[in-house]
């Protein structure tokens, strides 16, 4: 009989720490609902004390989802725990995730403290959190570099204090898989009453070993894994949810199973990628567009004879289905609504669906077929409806051997502004014209263009990074016209620093 492994998703907390990947509350709810459909056991919804936005997001996510446990992160600080408990008040199943650094590096340089004081603070935090909730998870930050004997003392003490889950993070991504596995095994063998709590993994990917370390932890007794969709996260990212889910599905001999509905992996991956403006690496395991592509002649020949020659997974097991409905200009609202639902996006408001359908028809008139990525892009355009600064019109004249000229119209909170400029190419001319209206000192730091699919009629995605007053702001634009997409991305940056200011 298989043992149960609990999946703790931290896409909305740790995953959102990627620069430029911040979501608003509506988008976070959308992801949380998709994670519920995916079958995750715990959703870490945010760090409530860090900002009013995170606090509100935890409240709204608690209201929006039904069966997963909603978790809020805190430091080992009473105020943090108070705020987290308040944010979780609407959650049907709630957990407070509190903790403190336990490595000598953290104790000495971060806390200017000693081991005994850190141990006392850890126990006090768990006891304080237990006043609010039964389910308390403790994290020993930088456990990967904490010596096993002291770590075991901390784990034993917090379990005695009432911790129901103990998280052993490889915070810096330093551990080798064998080393991390031995650490979990040591705890399982040396901590009294270890059976009273679930040991959890939380691995970072700085050396590319997050998934391997997580798997090693599971093989040695951990029964919760902390993961993110597409492996997104701070620095080099976290353990990828889809990788752990499919490893266990492919290796049933391990005798460990999750509650993940793997057929929703692809849709979840694309939703997160679209909302966070974070392109998926083409050769990314499980969810990259090349994950099930075969270009080598020898491989193609084998697959044509029998797919098992080179494919260890059925693409349909992760939700990749080549027989899906093709959307064109003749597709109706029902077909679009069905496709949105398949991608995890449900619209109860007919007005919002009508608005997306109008955008869909405009795009379908320009393209032969509208793909799933296009649909996600159209749905994501909702976030810009509330922006104070919007593009009204754009006209560009360009050619070989001549300076490009751009005329642009901008709507700023209902007021219309127009300007024109020349430039070294159409994008440069359009951005210069826009700068004449905005009159802010901004420096373009990063500019990337990506085609969503293939074809001359494809939608281009532009990711942009702009520096203003010492701060970096990230913008995104998508359009069949790459100049318009570039201007949209620049305006997105401006709206973000206007909101931040």
Which role fits each region the language model picked out?
Residues 175, 181-305:
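Catalytic alpha/beta core domains of metabolic enzymes, predominantly
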Residues 47-48, 73-76, 100-102, 141-143, ...:
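Short, ordered loop/turn segments at secondary-structure junctions
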Residues 5-7, 17-42, 55-64, 78-199, ...:
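Alpha/beta enzyme core
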Residues 17, 22, 30-31, 365-473, ...:
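Non-catalytic terminal/interface segments that mediate subunit docking, oligomerization
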Residues 4-5, 11, 246, 253-420, ...:
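A mid-to-C-terminal "edge-of-domain" accessory segment
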Residues 67, 170-171, 226-234, 249-258, ...:
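Short beta-alpha connecting loops at secondary-structure transitions
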